[in-house]
Amino acid sequence: MNLPRANPPTSAVPATSASSLARWITPERAFAVIAFLFGHALVLVIPPFQAADEPFHFLRAYQITDGVFISRQHDARGVAMGEFPVSLYQVWLPFSYMGFNLSVKASLQDIRDGLRIRLNPAKRMRIAIPSTAYYSPACYLPQCAGIMIGRALGVGPLAMLYLGREANLLAWILLGYASLRAAPMIARPLFLLLLMPMSMYLASTASADVSTNAFAVLFTATVLKYSVLPQPDSIGPARFLALLMLSLAVCLCKFAYVPLLALLLLIPPRNFGRPARYAAQILVLAAASASVWLFSISIGPGLDGKIRLTDEVSARMQFQWLAHHPLRFAPVLLQTFRLKGWVVLQSYVGLIGWLDMFLPAAFVIGYLILLILACLPNDDKPPLPPPWRAAVIVLPAVVCSFLIIALLSYLYWTPVQAAFIDGLTGRYLIPLSPAVFLVMSSAMRRDSRFRWPCSARTLNALMVLISIFACIYFLAVVRNRYYG
């Protein structure tokens, strides 16, 4: 007699646990976790003041917490100055020899000694802040919050620096998370951009570039979200206020990125409602942004301000030379691309310290290729603006912003009549990158050959693994630079 076979015992672990985990790993959640873990590691591993201009960013943030929102003091050379506690200079001094010198390593004893220095705000001295005095307080909102917490707790200036770094990192994570939530159609390249070594290095310091980059990225992501809303009249007061605040933030942080406001034209007029309402709201956005932009220019250095402290650089003389020879700027740009193009790409992906150390060429090239591949779609959802519309609006705005950045670098950082532009670094391209991703992603969707043959979950998991590897490698390189 044949007896029926018993079914094998089922596992106590649900079969759907792996798929549930895969569903949970969205780009914004993965970014928040990875950025939080590796960002805090970098905050501690990067020695004090070891990012480009971090001492001056810290001084400017402290100056704002003193109530000096617009810096007006200058010395006889036209260099911006400020009155600061002597202790801020004392904590910087032991670390001032590390920049541009790979042989000098960090000392944990110097950090411990620096943490023992008290603020003593009554004892002050004049300190030059040539490169950051003209920055708007909007660039330093997180750092100021950290410093004010430190002042309330009565800690020393070096502890305030670390609190400013912490606040900067948390702001980067929060705004990056919001950007990824707003623009799932470009989430993969945006994810890689936000976790790129250069982005994470800056986010772990007191640099003003963090707010500048984060606001520009969130502005682009928000405009992209609003441009594909399915219902007419979908931009109500709350969404319009978000557009207005982000537009003003972009203008306040760095006016070279004001051309990005042209991306507002990606939003169909019907999304604002009636034609009269659309015209009125666009007029409000334009007028408010123009006012803030003019304010930013008014508090700038002017042509007589000195940012690079060398007699060979004069913004006024450079401007006068360009005014008489405007066609010379094109050959200067071409020569810059020829001589400095690779350096710009290197400093876009990852740069350690004060131009101290670049990542290997293979890593840089590989990461750039990954950014391009991440723009490839695996389906047609969520929607994107048509490629022709995206290109016509976005590319002129990006080119215009880049030309402004190049011109400012030529005026304020390059010797007069030099054949190429000095001071042009790749980190200035980070705020422009999401707009470029938008154009690339929209164009690739037009051709069915440009498709990933796998699911979005698989792509997200692969992207997370690559980013974790890149962060671990970068953290090891930074540690070896300063403590190896």
Regions from the language model: what does each represent?
Residues 293-381, 484:
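Membrane-lumen/periplasm interface segments of multi-pass, membrane-embedded glycan/lipid transferases
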Residues 222-233, 258-289:
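Perimembrane helix-loop-helix junctions
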Residues 205-212:
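Short acidic/glycine- and proline-prone juxtamembrane loop motifs at membrane-interface regions
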Residues 1-40, 279-285, 386-395, 455-465:
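Start-transfer (signal-anchor) and selected internal transmembrane alpha helices
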Residues 153-158, 177-198:
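Transmembrane-helix signature of polytopic, membrane-embedded enzymes
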Residues 239-247, 271-298, 391-400, 460-466:
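Hydrophobic alpha-helical membrane-interfacial segments at the cytosolic entry of transmembrane helices
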Residues 200-201, 236-255, 260-266:
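Membrane-interface alpha helices of multi-pass inner-membrane proteins
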